[in-house]
From Swiss-Prot:
Keywords: Capsid protein, Host nucleus, Virion. Interacts with TRX2, MCP and capsid vertex component 2/CVC2. Belongs to the herpesviridae TRX1 protein family. This is Triplex capsid protein 1. The lineage of its organism: Viruses, Duplodnaviria, Heunggongvirae, Peploviricota, Herviviricetes. One of its GO terms (molecular function) is DNA binding. Structural component of the T=16 icosahedral capsid. The capsid is composed of pentamers and hexamers of major capsid protein/MCP, which are linked together by heterotrimers called triplexes. These triplexes are formed by a single molecule of triplex protein 1/TRX1 and two copies of triplex protein 2/TRX2. Additionally, TRX1 is required for efficient transport of TRX2 to the nucleus, which is the site of capsid assembly. GO terms for cellular component: host cell nucleus; viral capsid. The keyword Coiled coil does not apply. InterPro entries: Herpes_1 (IPR004999). It comes from the Viruses. It is found in: Virion; Host nucleus.
Amino acid sequence: MNLGGNRFVQIGNGMSNIMYTDANGAVRWEQISPPAGFPQQQRGRGRGHVAFGLPNTLDWLPGFVQATPNSITISNMGGIQISSAGVITAAINSEQNSWMLSSFNPSLKLTRQVTLTDFCDPTAERPGLPIIRLRHHLDAIGSSPSSTPPGRNPQELDEAWAALSELSVSGRSDTTGLRPSLLSLTFLVASRSGEYSDKAAAEAVRAHVLANYRDRRTEQRLDRFGEYLQAMVRTHVFPHKHMTVFGGLISHVIQDKLASLTAVAGGVQEGARTNNSAVPRSSVYVPACAFLDVDHELKLGDASAKFVYLIFVYSQRLRREGVRVYVAVSKFDEVAFEDAVSFLFHKARTESAIRGTEGADAPEPHPNAALPLQELSSSRCEPRCPPSRLNNREFTNALYQWAPDLRGRPNRTSCMYAAYIRLGAIASDSPRTTRRSERFGSVDMPVVWLENVRWDPQDWVECSY
């Protein structure tokens, strides 16, 4: 902006300060008298600096503006519009009602990891697919002896992993340290495709994995991975406890069976560039059989910003354990979403509560296993303890000591039917979810596209009866 012969320029309209420049380029700001109709505004308490002008002034501009006798340099033009010669006005973001210029340059958090392509072949997928990170299998196997209900064999989990690792690229007795540490959502859905209500869409996902993962052992790997998930539920080492969210795939580098994947772990998926010049931007997509619009199912309307969740649904029927995974959108936060999950998956909730203890080989309960509350309260000889003395062992040691035996009885773990984690949100009043069939190699697979997903993974929330 050329100043010409002007010695000052007004920034804003109805401002409390005016910026002056001299021949040396020095800048000073002076107050102006209040325009007619605008009251004085006291800043702070007591006597001090008094400003005049509109409630919203552009006092932040000195940090963005560098003035010389001939020009004004604006460091960040995002959100600035020129309304007339010599006048600069800030364009207000009507959606966020914010003056933050940085909102036009959203921050991104990218993550990268090297993995074997046993459970995730990035060449067969498109950017935007959710990727799941797997913990080391020894963590699950090590926790199975303590979590397995009495009467069930914790070694079944070790045997299921051994059978699966025989089909791994690295083999069962690998000592290189490389392992399949990432899992694609399509592979996870394909391994349990028989459990989804939309059979045609689920079979299309399985056909896509079999056709495009380019490994003759892919079908066996899918079957054994599904059996491994069943063994995790049977031993109460639930899959969600050993899986975390990696992010939305954007690019990869692959050589033989080793791949380096880059994903968006925080921020808007469309804000990151892919390594495909034909499609430089990507949106999140999920298999259609694994997508769930909770608000639509509950008939709550669609015009609202939505959260995005990843849900694991379990069935604890012995030897017929079930595992399903969904990506769901809903206006509910993490607390209210649990009630929606309980309503939508009431069959799994009831079945897990009834059959979660099947096969338990626990000892018979002692005749006096129940707390004799009525006898204790009616007996005058039993010691009492006032509430103010509950932290005093001298008083509590004399009370009736009751240690119940919960082996073989229903508990929170045996009644667990689901777990969910918030992946992020779609910050739009009218979020767009589009279902269409996409071509993956020689296979057509129905998918659902989610636009403007902002990744912000949280913690797992477990649901029990």
